[in-house]
């Protein structure tokens, strides 16, 4: 088994129930203009089952952040690179999946396959 790794996903969206409602409506009413593909491919009204199962069955630690949380974790430098997946290792944040790759995924299965390949 591989070592436990610290994986951080950062949504290109704000957190909170009000923003969740607005984002959900935006995804369905105008999906082509929605700016968070990570949200788009991992959530419908709730977390998609395949994605949820992957996260829950993994031995890695996952953290999910929203725009307003970047400064709490010293990640302001990534504000223009969202959505993104990072790995925290030895106090540094390394990019696992950059914005371009994240935005290329058509569904959660492509994201899961990419993560399995990299982890």
Stretch-by-stretch model annotation:
Residues 1-5, 117-119:
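Basic/polar N-terminal segments that are highly enriched at the extreme N-terminus
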Residues 81-97:
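A short, hydrophobic beta-strand/beta-hairpin element that forms part of a small beta-sheet core
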Residues 50-81, 86:
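Thioredoxin-like thiol-disulfide oxidoreductase module
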Residues 109-119:
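Charged phosphate-binding loop/patch that engages nucleotide di/tri-phosphates or the phosphate backbone
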Residues 4-45:
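Local sequence-structure signature of Cys/Sec-based thiol-disulfide redox active-site neighborhoods
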Residues 23, 27-30, 56, 60, ...:
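Short, intrinsically disordered, mixed-charge
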Residues 2, 12, 17, 60-64, ...:
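Histidine/cysteine-enriched polar flanking segments
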């Amino acid at each position: 088994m591989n070592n436990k790794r610290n994986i951080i996903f950062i949504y290109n969206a704000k957190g909170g129930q009000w923003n969740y409602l607005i984002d959900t409506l935006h995804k369905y009413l105008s999906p082509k203009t929605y700016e968070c593909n990570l949200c788009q491919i991992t959530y419908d009204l709730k977390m998609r089952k395949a994605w949820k199962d992957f996260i829950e069955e993994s031995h890695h630690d996952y953290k999910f952040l929203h725009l307003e949380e970047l400064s709490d974790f010293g990640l302001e430098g990534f504000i223009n690179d969202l959505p993104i997946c990072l790995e925290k290792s030895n106090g540094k944040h390394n990019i696992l999946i950059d914005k371009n790759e994240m935005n290329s995924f058509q569904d959660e299965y492509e994201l899961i396959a990419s993560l399995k390949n990299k982890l």
